[in-house]
Amino acid sequence: MTCVLAGGYSQVSLAQQAKSGKLTQFVNPRIGTGGHGHVFLGANVPFGYVQLGPTEPSRGWDWCSGYHHSDSILIGFGHQHLSGTGIGDLGDVAFLPVVDGNQKQIKFSHDNENVRPGYYAVKLQQPNVWVELTATQRAGFQRYTFGADAQQAQLVLDLKQGIGWDAAKDFNVDNTTATTVAGHRFSKGWANDQKAFFFAEFSQPVTVKPLGAGRWLITAADVTKPLLVKTGLSAVSAENAKLNLEKEIPGWDFRQVVADADAAWNKELAKVNIETSDSTSRRIFYTAMYHTMTAPSVFSDVNGQYRGADGKVYDGNFTNYTTLSLWDTYRAAHPLMTMIHTDMLPDMASTFINIYRQQGKLPVWHLMGNETNCMVGNPGIPVLADMVLKGYVKDKEGAYEAMKKSAMLDERGMGLLKKYGYLPYDKEPTKETVAKGLEYALADACVAKVARMLGKKEDAKYFENRSKAYSKYFDKETGFMRGLSSDGKYRVPCNPFSAEHRADDYTEGNAWQYTWLVPHDVHGLVKLFGNEKKFVTKLDSLFIVTGEMGANASPDISGLIGQYAHGNEPSHHVLYMYNYVGQPWKAARLLRQTLDEMYKDDFDGLSGNEDVGQMSAWYVLSSVGLYQVEPAGGKYVIGSPIFDKAELNVGKGKTFNIVCKNNSKENMYVQSVKLNGKPYSKSYIMYNDIMKGGTLELQMGNQPSKWGTRPADRP
């Protein structure tokens, strides 16, 4: 029987639509533009350098992307934005249609916006103009259609304007002709030394008049004709910006560029095809897929040149990437990438290795070629290790050198780790020692795995021992990870609910949330509790207990179920820990609750910052029933899929299908599993089995079962 879905599509025709490239219709780019989502709204293509979209005045933390649904004032259409971050930056090379050169902002209504992947439009009143935006990887394309009452077609080019921390320090229009403007904008912000060069071309002759304060008035010759603006960007030079533009947008067919952007999105969205009768979940899913591909961003020009982490220009034989929010994305976004974007991985690995060679360590949080050192731990290590262990890195020795050297530095608390075997809270001036120590431990486990793979036994032993340092912070008396002093005493008093942002032993969290940050050795953590029963009792309590975190708690602690904070990344693996102790049904119930309550088809549809794709990647993986808990190596824990079928295109013409029989909101519990037609009792599946292609068939029911309970079947 064929089940008819909302909108008139059947499950059969949905699959056909996926293959014919119609998935962009299921994307709602407004999800996450309100609340604390901090999501970019505008025109871009998958993993593009350019994110062309509206910029509003920076009014606080919720404007980190330059846009928030609560606002109705525009100050420009900038060519670069961040998505889902907790710090604002970029906003480079902004244009604004104006009545005259004195105008610096425009009111707008969300009712007059039209947005879909690769396209943004808005109708403005003062001036009366229809603004349309689209983009390629390295160029933006704008079309301004002025109303019949318009006296002039005028734009202001603003090179001083930026978002959040961004402050322009050097900018100019360096060259103009009758139809072109070229220049640069150098800024200091979250990215300490960002260089942006641009080359803009207009569809009709223009005059360019400097207004001062980084603003230029551009007046077109004919107000009765649409004014089109094509702008190439580069971090290397204006000449490269021109090359990028000539290569990617050689003509003036705006509709074709929109169609090409739509096709690019459809191609990538079709990496996962789902079948479901729930139209809302379908929109949430494909919007989540869309959000996972805003970054990493291409950061090399069409001629291969890119600006390195040392500020020098390099000729690369690979695609270089930036916007590496690794503390967030090592958990789900990159493991998802290793499943459906395998073609990107060799270049991604080359990016990491070359960043190491240029700055002396792997990236921590890289933005526009700049190391921001934002967040804690060594998050570049698990991402690179995962690519090595999964077979996508040719230069394994170079990758290992980068990991080892990064783990053996003395900065950011690692010197204390080498001296004491942990990070004493009384010796680390920047605080957050428990969070740092736990992150270093899981990264060390990844170094150990690669060392063992390469036959480096002594190194493997050393880093395996260091990866056990998490046990030093565990206080068996209270059952929490706690700050430890240099003389071996736990910090007192112990209030596991308390959270003092940037001033205690945790990063954007508390003891309840950080006690579980041992994804690389869950069984070792269980032993610290004494036995599985005590571990489960504590884990059960996590989702029930409530308490006051205090006035200075981080706003990132959000999306709470008890003290489980889905709105922030350190919690993202925790639900799956039940599989490790033979109780996958508890994970299933909580997974369904989280998928249902923390993701909505609404502008306020995310429970926390989108964090450059991580929040959405969790949804993508968990909704199809898989999650890589251990940071590297490819062990994907099986959860509770919400779709009747998910088809993952894993490359080389192969697909991995996840089929759920008897699935419904009530039938959330796995009863039995078959892998390629044969009974499968394990509550996890290995990466290599996924990438071979095949079918994982799950029989679902409304009661817990014995599936996955035996010790031999646990992760």
Question: Model features per residue range: what roles?
Answer:
Residues 443:
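ATP-dependent phospho-/nucleotidyl transfer catalytic cores
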Residues 669:
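Extracellular attachment/recognition segments
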Residues 656-662:
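Beta-strand-rich recognition domains
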